[in-house]
Amino acid sequence: MSRILSHAKKNYRKAIVIESLLLVVFYLLIYGWQRQSAVDFSYGFLSAFLPFCTFIFIIFYRKQNFSTKLTALYRAEAIKFILTMVFIIIAIKWLFVINFIAFFVGFLLALVLNNIIPLILNKI
């Protein structure tokens, strides 16, 4: 079982690196077109990406017994959901998102990448 978990941990570490690089690439591409849209896109992307990173940390990098793994999974998912809501509220209320379309495109793209990249890495 530990071999499977270590393989999954390695795949998620790669997924986080790939997704971080994609954030930078997308930001630079959009920045060349319109600066404020690039910032709003990044806020949306980070609103989904940072809770995903927190989820991965709680599941794979905290010491816990095997019997409490399922409880940790549910707890991590709840924390991820709450953090996502907090980041969206912060972005809209205090960071003054102007282009909501760019914000939610970044958010949805991060959600898709959070699911697709680990699946692709698992197939390789």
From Swiss-Prot:
It is found in: Cell membrane. Keywords: Cell membrane, Membrane, Transmembrane, Transmembrane helix. Coiled coil: none annotated. The chain crosses the membrane at residues 14-34, 41-61, 85-105. GO terms for cellular component: plasma membrane. InterPro entries: ATP_synth_I. Its main location: membrane. It is a multi-pass membrane protein. NCBIfam families: PRK06099.1. This is Uncharacterized protein HI_0485.1. It comes from Haemophilus influenzae (strain ATCC 51907 / DSM 11121 / KW20 / Rd).
